[in-house]
């Protein structure tokens, strides 16, 4: 399959077989020659331990960006919350559900939700997103099904944390927004009577409104990597990308040195960080905090308590009585910049594609002589204002 045919496939339905062909082509060839790629990029030789260098362009910004054209929310402090046109790409487990609820509570414009396999199967992800939207009274938001597997390795589900359904085993207590059985659905969303793949929709939305869409990648980065392969200009058409994944200190949660989202699809993380020509902010695993949400008797609070019960059982030994915020921190960083307490600016980073204990690790150039081929940079959030995050989360369930 040549690049011309790959681009043409954007106009046609991405069947599972086509998707797999593109994936195989993606990981065995050099990227197209274009200004989004690092000059030092080399084709991936599958099976050979190696590190691909990350080369990302971003504009210079302050640690806490100024609020331009802000929209005021009704949070208690009266602090400003930015309005953004958001697309959330999720592998909807418990933390993704919280992030989606938070985004909908902060008066942002959620244009669409795209689904990728990760915490649970992509079939479950579509259903879980619909459940969250129904609980929030926002079932009109379109949902698109995407990749059901990583680019080059088997999918490793997170059942032990998120439950077999991705929502702590309570999904049957909350109806989906659509009537009927979803088990046999191929995709969600349609154009001219045919299903639309999430990667196609991401490309179309960014192309229609260049510079307007903020993309939140809250699961494995497979859909975004596929979109960048189909359309090398996809990243340039986005306003910015925020990623939940990677690490700073080399601490992992699925491998000694790797975080789940990057470890699930390291090649996809590498593609996004090398080819997306737009500002990128990474919220790594170490930045996660715990926060208590007020006990309120609302539909959203009951939903949150139900889906987090399973996850909290996983953390009983820690003695924590709060919810692990996870993906919701990315939403806070996007819409409430004052929630960010500290960040590393202009970081040069690389994704480790080999390694028995470190595959998927986000490696940093801590001194100027390290990673000399990496010139472009990303912003990495390292800590949050816990009081501000707690305030946002408490308002989330009202």
Regions found by a protein language model. Give the residues of each.
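Active-site histidine-anchored catalytic micro-motif
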Residues: 76-131, 139, 171-290
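Phospho-regulated, proline-rich, acidic Ser/Thr-rich intrinsically disordered regions
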Residues: 7-10, 14
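A glycine-rich helix N-cap at a beta->alpha junction
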Residues: 136-144
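Cysteine-centered motifs
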Residues: 34-37
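Conformational coupling and interaction surfaces
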Residues: 64-84, 99-105, 109, 260-267, ...
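Low-complexity, intrinsically disordered or signal/transmembrane-proximal segments
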Residues: 8, 41-42, 50, 57
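Surface-exposed loop and adjacent secondary-structure segments within mature catalytic domains
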Residues: 144-176
């Amino acid at each position: 399959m040549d690049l011309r045919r790959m681009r043409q496939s954007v106009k046609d339905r991405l069947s599972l077989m086509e998707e797999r062909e593109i994936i195989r082509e993606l990981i065995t060839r050099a990227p197209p020659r274009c200004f989004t790629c690092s000059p030092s990029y080399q084709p991936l030789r599958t099976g050979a331990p190696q590190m691909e260098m990350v080369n990302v362009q971003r504009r210079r910004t302050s640690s806490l960006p100024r609020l331009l054209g802000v929209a005021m929310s009704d949070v208690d402090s009266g602090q400003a919350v930015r309005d953004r046109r958001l697309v959330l790409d999720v592998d909807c487990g418990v933390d993704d559900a919280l992030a989606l609820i938070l985004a909908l509570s902060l008066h942002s414009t959620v244009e669409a939700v795209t689904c990728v396999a990760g915490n649970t199967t992509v079939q479950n992800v579509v259903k879980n997103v619909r459940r969250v939207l129904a609980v929030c009274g926002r079932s009109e938001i379109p949902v698109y099904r995407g990749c059901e597997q990583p680019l080059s390795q088997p999918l490793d589900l997170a059942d032990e944390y998120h439950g077999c359904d991705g929502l702590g085993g309570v999904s049957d207590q909350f109806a989906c927004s659509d009537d009927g059985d979803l088990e046999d659905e191929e995709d969600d969303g349609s154009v001219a009577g045919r299903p639309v793949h999430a990667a196609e929709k991401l490309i179309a939305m960014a192309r229609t409104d260049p510079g307007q869409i903020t993309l939140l990648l809250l699961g494995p980065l497979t859909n975004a990597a596929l979109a960048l392969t189909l359309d090398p200009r996809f990243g340039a058409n986005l306003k910015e990308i925020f990623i939940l994944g990677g690490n700073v200190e080399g601490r992992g949660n699925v491998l000694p040195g790797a975080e789940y989202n990057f470890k699930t699809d390291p090649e996809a993380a590498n593609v996004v960080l090398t080819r997306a020509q737009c500002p990128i902010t990474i919220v790594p695993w170490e930045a996660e905090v715990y926060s208590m949400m007020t006990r309120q008797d609302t539909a959203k609070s009951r939903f949150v308590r139900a889906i987090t019960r399973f996850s909290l059982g996983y953390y009983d030994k820690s003695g924590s009585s709060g919810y692990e915020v996870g993906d919701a921190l990315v939403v806070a960083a996007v819409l409430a910049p004052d929630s960010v307490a500290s960040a590393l600016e202009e970081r040069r980073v690389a994704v480790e594609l080999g390694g028995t204990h470190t595959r998927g690790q986000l490696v940093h150039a801590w001194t100027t002589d390290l990673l000399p081929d990496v010139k472009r940079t990303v912003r990495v959030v390292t800590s949050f204002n816990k009081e501000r995050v707690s305030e946002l989360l408490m308002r989330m369930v009202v």
